[in-house]
Amino acid sequence: MPVFRLSDRLVFPSPHLARHDGLLCLGGDLTPERILLAYQNGIFPWFSPGDPLLWWSPDPRLVILPGQLRVSRSLQKRINRNVYTITMDQAFGRVINACADLRNRSGQGTWLVQEMIEAYIGLHERGYAHSVEAWNAGTLAGGLYGISLGGCFFGESMFSTMADSSKTALAALDRHLVKQKFDLIDCQVKTDHLVSMGGVEIPRKDFLTRIHGSLEKKTIKGPWIFTGF
């Protein structure tokens, strides 16, 4: 399959035309309108420093269904002991920067370039991007962030500096989405970590069918408030 080049027009090629590795197109911009249109069509931006802006729609797609998150006994004990205090949308900028910084310090490099960080902070200010924070004694110990549209939460990244802090944040997100009757959490691509917590791969065509139906629901904009496990 060819890789398409985007013009200034606010349009994407069909995600079914993506290459076998999931790469669909390059170019365009990171305006809020384009990013939201991408998610509505099962597409997301992902590129490294020095690369052109790349857009992806992998097949299969990893998802977690709200209410089916797998919580280990050790994690449940931490939750029961209130090791972490959970908040939502209280430190979005700190969470997204921590996700980028942790990968850089680990030597993995990061796709969270400054342009991406600024774009998602802009989406947070518009009420579409959300963060979940896990605090320990007033210190931000872990968290995650993503985009909410309709009944879908499109997860982007998470970080952890203390044991099970990001897992606790994910468990809190799952509980919140169950209460709000969300349909799925998009995890994009398979990782052993997410599979161990209940992530399942589904064909892209099934993923697109699910999100297109779920996007008929009203988008619940932020700030979100966590009401407990």
Swiss-Prot record:
Its EC number is 2.3.2.6. The keyword Glycosyltransferase does not apply. It catalyses: N-terminal L-lysyl-[protein] + L-leucyl-tRNA(Leu) = N-terminal L-leucyl-L-lysyl-[protein] + tRNA(Leu) + H(+); N-terminal L-arginyl-[protein] + L-leucyl-tRNA(Leu) = N-terminal L-leucyl-L-arginyl-[protein] + tRNA(Leu) + H(+); L-phenylalanyl-tRNA(Phe) + an N-terminal L-alpha-aminoacyl-[protein] = an N-terminal L-phenylalanyl-L-alpha-aminoacyl-[protein] + tRNA(Phe). It comes from the Bacteria. InterPro entries: Acyl_CoA_acyltransferase (IPR016181), Leu/Phe-tRNA_Trfase (IPR004616), Leu/Phe-tRNA_Trfase_C (IPR042203), Leu/Phe-tRNA_Trfase_N (IPR042221). It is an enzyme of class 2 (transferase). Transmembrane segments: none annotated. It is found in: Cytoplasm. GO terms for cellular component: cytoplasm. The keyword Plastid does not apply. One of its GO terms (biological process) is protein catabolic process. GO terms for molecular function: leucyl-tRNA--protein transferase activity. SUPFAM superfamilies: Acyl-CoA N-acyltransferases (Nat) (SSF55729). Keywords: Acyltransferase, Cytoplasm, Transferase. Functions in the N-end rule pathway of protein degradation where it conjugates Leu, Phe and, less efficiently, Met from aminoacyl-tRNAs to the N-termini of proteins containing an N-terminal arginine or lysine. Belongs to the L/F-transferase family. This is Leucyl/phenylalanyl-tRNA--protein transferase. It comes from Desulforapulum autotrophicum (strain ATCC 43914 / DSM 3382 / VKM B-1955 / HRM2) (Desulfobacterium autotrophicum). The gene is aat.
